[in-house]
Design a protein with these regions (language model features):
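Contiguous segments within soluble domain cores/interaction surfaces
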Residues: 1-101
Length: 101
């Protein structure tokens, strides 16, 4: 896919993964999204698995500019690079916008 992948979060550390073409409601179990977060400059990767359309708890600081994420489980492995973080009220509501690389 060449579509933008949006990793949306509401409240710190609660992340929901979805994209424009395949909404969470359209995904049927057991479709599972596997998210691997690689910190910039090296360090240990963090891996999370969640059923499509669900929320999961991520470690603080995982989604910051420069982190590289790998998302798999819908159609194919998607390698994405975080290109921006939009912070909302109280810096607890935020949206991570990623795209394929």
């Amino acid at each position: 896919m060449s579509d933008t992948i949006y990793v949306g979060a509401t409240y710190r550390g609660r992340v929901k993964v979805y994209n424009r073409e395949v909404s969470p409601a359209a995904l049927v179990a057991p479709d599972t999204l596997v998210i691997t977060v690689s910190p910039p400059g090296g360090g240990a990767d963090s891996t999370y698995s969640l059923a499509a359309g669900t929320l999961t708890t991520l470690a603080a600081g995982d989604y910051t500019f420069g982190h590289v994420c790998t998302i798999a489980g819908v159609h194919e492995v998607e390698s994405v690079s975080v290109i921006g973080v939009r912070v909302g009220v109280g810096q607890d509501d935020f949206t991570v916008i990623a795209r394929n690389v």
